[in-house]
Amino acid sequence: MEGFDLSLGKGLKPLFDDAPARFRRRISGVDYLHLKGRQSGDLFITRAGWPAASSILPERWFTGAQFSKPGQALAGATGAVYRVPVAHPVRSNFALVVKFSRFGQDVGITVAGNELTDDAEFMSRVDHAEFLPPFEEFGNLMRLRNQCGRHFATKAPLAIYSPPTRYLAWQLG
């Protein structure tokens, strides 16, 4: 098991704002607490994810080779996106949406219509399109949430996990 110390070496789990500075990161405008696992995996937990940290630990939903048995692929998702129920101390119906990042992979856009394909600059951007890294995805989502307020309901981004083992795309779904 990867194992992460949610007490941050303090014995009791601190409040997000009381975490020691050595654990704090701000990436793409989002605040994280960065925890290093015993097997060298990295877990970046957002302010929204910190209250549920014990439920979002990777050992709750990822066995190292696959999702825990109840996980299921989300229909219509682009990429490997799963809904995985996990145990939560207060909420009986708690589930995570887990997405494996395809950062740096080609997007594979198909463009229809002559007016678009005649624009060389546009087609150059399409030809070089890649998926964003997860930190940029979270940053963009948080900017969107902040600009739209309560008029735009989304799930809160909780954490980014980078396992110590690297996987090929086909191994992740």
PLM region spans:
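Conserved ATP-binding subdomain of kinase catalytic cores across diverse folds
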Residues: 55-173
